[in-house]
Amino acid sequence: MTNRLIYILLAAIAAILPASAAVRTSLGAPDLDAIRTASTDEASPYYYPTLLEKFSHNDTVMTDVEFQYFYYGALFQEDYDPYREQTDAATHMQLLPLFNKKEWSRAERRQIQAHAERCLLDIPTNLRQLTNLIYVYEQNGKVDLARIWQYKLNHLLLVIASSGNGLTPETAWVVVYPQDEYDFLNLSGITAKDQQFTPPSCDYIIVNRKTESSPEGYYFNIAELIRQYYIKHPSEADDAQLPDDAPQEQPQSTDPQQ
């Protein structure tokens, strides 16, 4: 799937992948303790349900900080599960061949939009489904809606980009869902080849290098992701014999979402 929106997205996050440093933004790495407190406090302006409602509106009023608290605040919600099953798996499989097409028919666009909206009800920050939704809006001639949701997607990508530079475990990008690793790289024009778990709490994504000087791969910090998974699945944590503060084994992942 190629279109001018993808190039706009690439331009928006082009600074994230040089070997020199992380993207220049005012956000920086997330303070997960502060986000945990604020996202579960009904009196906070960063209370997760408040930000979720704000995110769902067809406007561009959210700030960089609100996007950061919204993205990472999902980690601390009762229904959060990073390895949850694919939303509407049957439809997902049915639609897969369509994503090799450059243009979709009106009927195909309706199917893709409906599936994207169902997935976004489950995971509002699903980067891939946000991209699909934007593309449907553009093909349907709904330029204003495409721009609004492009704005939201760009800011979610910048939240991840600002969390590190991906070059070492210590400066790994911080993600909320495993699929975000692949979608983040793909939307940056980088193709993943393989994945390795790097103890205690990083995924290392091996990529197709663009040049000889390009990194062979990028690190993603999934420490809080794993911690929250084992909070929800304590029997698996017991089996893994993990210390309280350092997950050392990645749970079995389900198939990535389209």
What are the language-model segments listed below?
Residues R118-C119, L153:
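Canonical positions in the second alpha-helix
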Residues M1-G28:
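Bacterial Sec-dependent N-terminal signal peptides
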Residues E138-A161:
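TPR/TPR-like (Sel1-like) alpha-helical repeat modules
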